[in-house]
């Protein structure tokens, strides 16, 4: 079995050495733009060049180093029947949930106001926030979107979720399809986008949709 690593990492040994340790029977190669074909069975890629598919004609599957595959699908000569395997999580969902929570707290608790008061050496008490005044809407209920929604719902935030297809999540009010998008947006003050970039989602964060959010809305974009 031959494995080809094509990810543009300046230190590919960070990947190839562990792969070789886990697959001692495999030949592990690093992509060389000026080199010959290695007749790889599998390629591990991140935004691969077109030359990969011109040169490597025996590929059985491609493993994408990330959850988003839009960069891979954009390669014009990607064989249409070639199986693609993507990372569903690898710890990213927890990191994204933490990032969203951080940004939500920054906005809802007015942390920049307090930092400015700290710089000025003043102290002024502001009205405590009510979580009920900061309903969160998560666009996209894939692995990352579900993790974000569940994390915030577990902290007693009012959470809405929207996806193209129907989902059921405990503690989350879910909406599906374009026919329910307006209701979702009008019930949302903090919009969290976790959607991938596809033909269906391109430009979905537009003036028409953003203007339907609740007053003084905040957008947290962790998608494409």
Regions found by a protein language model. Name each.
Residues 28-39, 50-53, 171-188:
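Short acidic low-complexity segments
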Residues 81, 132-135, 207, 216:
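Phosphate-coordination loops involved in phosphoryl transfer and adenosine-cofactor binding
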Residues 160:
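Conserved beta-strand positions in the Rossmann-like core of class I SAM-dependent methyltransferases
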Residues 1-41:
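N-terminal glycine-/charge-rich "phosphate-binding" loop or analogous flexible N-terminal tail
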Residues 85, 114-147, 174:
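Glycine-rich NAD(P)-binding loop of Rossmann-like domains
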Residues 41-115:
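Phosphate/diphosphate ligand-binding glycine-rich loop within oxidoreductases
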Residues 165-224:
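Rossmann-like adenosine-cofactor binding region
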Residues 149, 153:
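Gly/Ala-rich phosphate-binding loop of Rossmann-like dinucleotide-binding domains
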């Amino acid at each position: 079995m031959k494995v080809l690593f094509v990810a543009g990492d300046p230190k590919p040994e960070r990947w190839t050495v562990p792969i070789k340790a886990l697959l001692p029977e495999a030949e592990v190669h690093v992509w060389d733009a000026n080199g010959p074909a290695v007749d790889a069975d599998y390629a591990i890629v991140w935004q691969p060049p077109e030359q990969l598919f011109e040169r490597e004609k025996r590929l059985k599957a491609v493993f994408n180093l990330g959850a988003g595959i839009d960069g891979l699908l954009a390669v014009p000569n990607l064989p249409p029947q070639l199986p693609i395997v993507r990372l569903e999580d690898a710890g990213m969902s927890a990191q994204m949930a933490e990032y969203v929570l951080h940004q939500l707290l920054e906005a809802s608790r007015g942390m920049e106001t307090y930092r400015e008061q700290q710089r000025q050496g003043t102290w002024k008490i502001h009205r405590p926030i009510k979580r009920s005044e900061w309903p969160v809407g998560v666009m996209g209920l894939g692995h990352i979107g579900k993790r974000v929604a569940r994390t915030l719902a577990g902290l007693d935030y009012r959470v809405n979720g929207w996806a193209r297809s129907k989902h059921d999540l405990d503690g989350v009010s879910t909406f599906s399809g374009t026919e329910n998008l307006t209701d979702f947006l009008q019930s949302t003050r903090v919009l969290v986008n976790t959607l991938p970039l596809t033909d269906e989602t391109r430009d979905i964060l537009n003036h028409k949709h953003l203007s339907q959010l609740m007053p003084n809305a905040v957008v947290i974009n962790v998608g494409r």
